[in-house]
Amino acid sequence: LIKIQTKSILAKTAVVISLCALCSSVFAAPTSKGLTKSEELYPQGWTVGDQIKFKKGTTASLNDNGAVISGVLASDTYLRPQGWQRIINDYYFVSAYTNRSPFFPRYYRYWNNNSTYNIALSSYGHIRYKGGTAVTFSEQGTVLNGTIADETTVGLGSEKYGFIAFKSGTILDFYNDGAVKKGTLAEDTKLRPVGWQNNAVDMENAGFVEFKGKSIVSFTPDGEVTNCTVKEPLKWKDNGVEIELPGGSIINFTEQGA
C-alpha cells in the first residue's frame, strides 16, 4: 500500500512539474537587450533570415527565441504594417542619372530637363518607418505600430470604400486584424463617429462629421471614430439629450453619445 501511494505521489508530482514547465514556455515573458552598438537583429514572425539594424544606446524587447518584439530603428526602414493590404500609396521613387534616354516599359518615369529621372517602384505593401523611433512587430512579422516617415494613405474598411491620409512623422497603430486603430490625420477629414445612427442631429450629412487635420484619431475595428478633434461646432445627442459640442475640441464618442 505504501509503495502504491508513493508511486501515485511521484506521478502527480511529475504531472505538476510538466504543467509548470509547459506554462513557463507558453507564457514566457519577453526579455530586454541593451544595445551598446547599432546591431542587426531578427524581427519575430519572419520566415526568411533578413535582419534589421536597431539603434545603439536603446533597448530591444525579445521573445523566447531571441527575435525582436519591439525596438528602435537605427535608420529609415521599409517594413510591412499589419494592415499592409489596405495601403494605397505603396510605391516609392528612386533617382537615376544618365546621358541617354533608356526605356523602362514596366515603370512610370518622371522626367526633368537634366540627365536625372525618377522611377516609381512598387513597395509591395511596405511603408517607410522613421529611424530613431520604436516599432512593434506582430507574431506574423508585420508592424503593429511605429512612426511613419511619409504621408501614408490607408483604406479604412476591409469591405467598404474610403481612404484616409495619415501625417508623416506620426505614429500609426493597427489592430491585430489589420484595421487602423490610431493615427494622425494629414488633412481635414469627414468620418462617422461611433453611435452616429442614433446620436447625429443633422442627418443631411449622412452621419459624417468633419475632423481637424493634424489631430490624433482613434477608431473602432469597424472604422468608426471614438476620439478626435471636431473642426466646427457640432450638434449631437448625449443619452438622448441634444447638445452642442464646441469646435476645435477633442471629443470622446460612445454609443450613448459624446
Indicate residue ranges for each PLM-predicted region:
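Glycine/tyrosine- and acidic-biased, solvent-exposed loop/turn segments at the edges of beta-strands
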Residues: 28-258
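Terminal low-complexity interaction tails
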Residues: 1-2, 254
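Bacterial N-terminal signal peptides that target proteins for export
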Residues: 2-15
